[in-house]
Structures are given as C-alpha cells and as structure tokens.
C-alpha cells in the first residue's frame, strides 16, 4: 500500500513511493531538471514545461503510480505557467528566478513595486507580461508548475490551486485565503488537502508549495520547529495566527494553522565561504588540496566555545539587502582556525534563533533538514544548545516529495488530517 509524491524542483525532480503503514520509502527516483531555456534577455529565467512533464510521466511509471493509493505533488513556488481553455500550456514556466518584474516601470517604481509584491512572484511576472503584450492570446488561467502537472495527469481543463501555492504568486490575503487583485487569469483556490481528479483511477491531491511540503515531510509533531540549512537557511513552525516582526513571514498551511518562516539568505553559504578561505590559505603554502570540510569537522569535534563573534548576514537580509556581516571581538588569543569556524557556525545559528525568539515560539524539539545541517554535527550541537532543544533528523532526505505523498494520503481518505498523516515520519538515531 504505497502513496506517491513528486517534487518539481528548479534543478531536480524527485519522486518517492512511501509505504503508508511503515512510513518507509520503498523507492526513490531523482532526475535532473534539464528544462532551462537559453535566453538572450538577462532577466529571463524560463523552463520548458513539456520537458518537465516528460520527467513527471517517467517518474509516475517508475514509481508504479497507477497502482498507488494516491498521488501528490509539490514544486518550486512563485513561478507561473499560462494555460488555455483545454488545460494545455501556452507558455514556458516563468520561474521564481525570473527578474523581469524588477525592471523599471513608472514613477520610479519597478513592475513588482507597482503591483505590490516581489519580483519573481507569479503575479508580478504576469503584470510585466500584461503591460508588455506578452500574455499569450488564448490564456485563460495561470498556475504554478506543480499545479499544472497535477492538472495534466488528471486530464483536467483548469487547475485547482492549494493556498500554499496561491500565496506564493503574490497579492494574496492569507487570512481570507483569496487574491487581493482583479485578474481574469487567477485560478480557483482551495485550503483543503483534497483530490482534484484521478490518474488511471488513482486520486491526485492538489499540489503544495515546496516550503510547506518540506515541513509536512519532516515534522511529525506540530509543536516542533524545523530548521533547514542549504545554501540559505530557514526556521519554520506552525502558528494558530499570523506572526509579525523580526524578519518573519507568515505563510498559509491548511486553513487552520499558518506556517511562520524566518529566512537567512546566507545560511550554509557562510560555512562554504569559510571553507573556501581555508583552502585559499592552504594554497599559499603550496597545498592545493580538495575539500577541507572533513578537516574542519575534526577541528570542531572538541570545540565548545569561543569569544570570537560572527554576524553571518554576508548576503544581506530580505528587509535590508545592503546590510553585511562582520567578524568581531578579535583578540590575539582567539584568531584561530577553530575559533573562526566555531564563530561562523554560532553566527549561522544565532541569525535563526533571533528570528525564532522574536516570534515567541517555544518548540518541544527541533527537526533539522538540509545537507548543511544533516552533515554538520558541530552545527547541530550549537543549534541544540542555543535553542535549548533536542535535535531530530528525518530518516529520509526527500522531505518535499515525502510531504506531498502524505498530503495525498489525506486526500485519498487514508488519514483524517495532515497531522495524523505526519505521525508515520521516521527519524535517525542521534
């Protein structure tokens, strides 16, 4: 009795088949997303929707989806595909990286600012296209690529978009779960984990945004918080009401709770910068070594404190892109490799902790996902100590596709709600 989840990422597309009783992944398949279309326009970041669909249909076959209990999707948020009245794509996928809405519009504002959302968000991209005559003539609706994939495999003519994806398009009221602008191409929205149709007789759940799907696929206890460390880093937790301040963003979840999220733009990149610095220093001594991560890990095995401080906002913040990080409180005794490495990890943790504490959350435990913390024992120790919480690491790293599968199990009637479904998540022994 398997459930299938597929996550359509920017660079890869991952599918899993999950045993609904044990919670084990019985099969996992990942394909590179080689659908980017070369463009002469510097701001344009688009992908070929048909190439993406070829990968999706291939995964459905490899995962034996036609014999599954239910199928779920998640995917890269913010981007849009235009569809016609038959449900066919009329455009490439304008991805979240597309920066056309950051171009100057009128009155000293960009297209995104004029609309009231961020560049890369689907409705900002659509606004630019509308103003410049680029919306396909027969377009009747727009949606994310995961919505499109779910709609296509069901043979539907129009998408039904979950609030987790709808909000990512911009101009969305998360309390009322509706769009705040008039646009004839806006899709129908749902707050439920519900089936939108069937694939060869198997129910297909409304697609989720990858952020919320990753939370669902990682966190078994709704009182826990999730820390994800990749190139950037993020802390998120469920809240009964919207959370304001401290660099936090509130996102829709299930119509009952919200997902509070604090994002650090540098995150794991800060540790990568440190490793690059150490390699550069080693090369000065004639040692053109490869990765120094194993050596840094060993250096930190017994390191428990430092008087050196590091502000790791090296890439700015969402609210202030121009702010920069710093190394402080340097003395003749603490400017060492071990102290610097420990200070950077401490700074990475503190940036997340400051956002967490401003939201007033007191988590029971911290779930840690993403290779930046899965593979870094020293960072886990620092995070655990700073937050005062026990650490849990999901057994499976395919969090978004796993979360999509759990949502599908709810849509297929195998669990009463998403919180019940999450109880089958397994964790590594620490």
Task: Indicate residue ranges for each PLM-predicted region.
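Short glycine-rich phosphate-binding loop at a beta-alpha junction
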Residues: 67-76, 140-142, 226, 361-371
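Gly/Ser/Thr-rich active-site cleft segment
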Residues: 8-10, 110-211
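Phosphate/pyrophosphate-binding loops at sites that engage ATP/ADP/AMP, CoA/4′-phosphopantetheine
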Residues: 56-69, 132-136, 180-184, 352-365
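ATP-dependent carbohydrate kinase catalytic cores
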Residues: 166-254, 266, 378
């Amino acid at each position: 009795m398997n459930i299938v989840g597929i996550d359509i990422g920017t660079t890869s597309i991952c599918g899993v088949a999950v045993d609904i009783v044990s919670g084990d992944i019985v099969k996992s398949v990942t394909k590179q997303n080689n659908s980017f279309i070369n463009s002469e326009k510097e701001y344009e970041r688009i992908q070929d929707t048909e190439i993406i669909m070829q990968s999706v249909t291939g995964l459905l076959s490899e995962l034996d989806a036609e014999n599954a209990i239910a199928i779920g999707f998640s995917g890269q948020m913010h981007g849009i595909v235009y569809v016609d009245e038959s449900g066919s794509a009329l455009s490439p996928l304008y991805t979240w990286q597309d920066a056309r809405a950051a171009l100057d519009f009128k009155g000293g504002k960009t297209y995104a600012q004029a609309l009231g959302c961020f560049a890369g968000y689907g409705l900002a991209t659509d606004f630019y296209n509308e103003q410049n005559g680029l919306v396909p003539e027969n377009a009747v609706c727009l949606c994310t690529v995961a919505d499109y994939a779910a709609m296509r495999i069901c043979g539907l003519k129009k998408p039904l978009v979950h609030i987790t994806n709808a909000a990512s398009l911009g101009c969305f009221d998360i309390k009322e779960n509706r769009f705040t602008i008039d646009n004839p191409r806006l899709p129908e929205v749902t707050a439920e984990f519900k089936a939108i149709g069937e694939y060869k007789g198997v129910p297909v759940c409304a697609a989720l945004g990858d952020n919320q799907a990753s939370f669902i696929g990682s966190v078994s206890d709704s009182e826990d918080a999730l820390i994800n460390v990749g190139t950037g880093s993020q802390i998120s937790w469920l809240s009964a009401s919207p959370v304001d301040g401290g660099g936090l963003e509130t996102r829709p979840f299930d119509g009952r709770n919200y997902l509070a999220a604090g994002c650090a733009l540098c995150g794991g990149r800060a540790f990568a910068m440190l490793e690059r610095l150490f390699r550069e220093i080693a090369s000065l001594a004639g040692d053109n070594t490869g990765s120094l991560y194993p050596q840094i890990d060993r250096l930190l095995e017994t390191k428990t404190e430092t008087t050196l401080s590091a502000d790791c906002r090296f890439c700015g913040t969402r609210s202030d892109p121009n702010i920069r990080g710093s190394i402080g409180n340097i003395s003749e005794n603490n400017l060492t490799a071990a102290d610097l490495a420990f200070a950077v990890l401490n700074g990475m943790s503190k940036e997340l902790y400051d956002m967490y504490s401003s939201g007033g959350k007191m988590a029971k435990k911290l779930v840690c996902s993403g290779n930046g913390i899965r593979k870094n024992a020293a960072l886990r120790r620092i995070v655990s100590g700073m937050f005062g919480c026990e650490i849990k690491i999901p057994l499976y790293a395919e969090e978004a596709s796993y979360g999509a599968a759990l949502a599908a199990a709810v849509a297929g009637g195998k669990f009463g709600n998403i919180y019940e479904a999450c109880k089958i998540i397994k964790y590594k022994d620490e």
